[in-house]
């Protein structure tokens, strides 16, 4: 990481009006790269130079940038703050580019999404999927799907679960302190939210955020 710091200092020496950084952390291990991202963000803010940071790493873009521009084959798909880009994607490309999404072509077969209609694709992210053991109490017990865990991966503070539901392999995260789930186990799955768009279209304003229709009903029942 020291070489990158020196190169950055040299680039700042002439006091440029604009700084271009093209994949500056591409050949660095993960921990050093994370440290350099924080350091670079602090330095750019302190010096006050407008910077263009080119990267294929979504985490780098989200952490370092004030504004992100996502391009696809030379076309600008969306521009906005990191929160806007991540939480309100405007095109199918952006929806599937950010996070760790799963595309679902048969979303109407899932509880709470039956009314969406045919001809829609949906994208779901791990943070919008709840996986619980059969023995655990769930607020949405009447709306869950049954799934089978195909893979469990340790991720430090949490585990990543790959769960097969309706021939779709969903990805979800579960806190490490929660009861362990094993491969091959049958579990309950609930999808809180999806990003939906017409199949085969790639317009600029055709992605809708759709919440599970059973959430409000289950909340009233639970209270």
Which residues does each predicted region cover?
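Residue-level signal for well-ordered alpha-helical positions
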Residues: 31, 97, 135-136
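ABC ATPase nucleotide-binding domains
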Residues: 1-91
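Non-catalytic connector elements of ABC transporters
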Residues: 112-223
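C-terminal boundary and immediately downstream tail of ABC-type ATPase nucleotide-binding domains
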Residues: 87-113, 121-123, 190
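Short, surface-exposed loop/turn motifs that are enriched in glycine and acidic residues
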Residues: 80-84, 96, 117
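Structural detector for hydrophobic anchor residues on beta-strands
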Residues: 49, 103-104, 145, 170
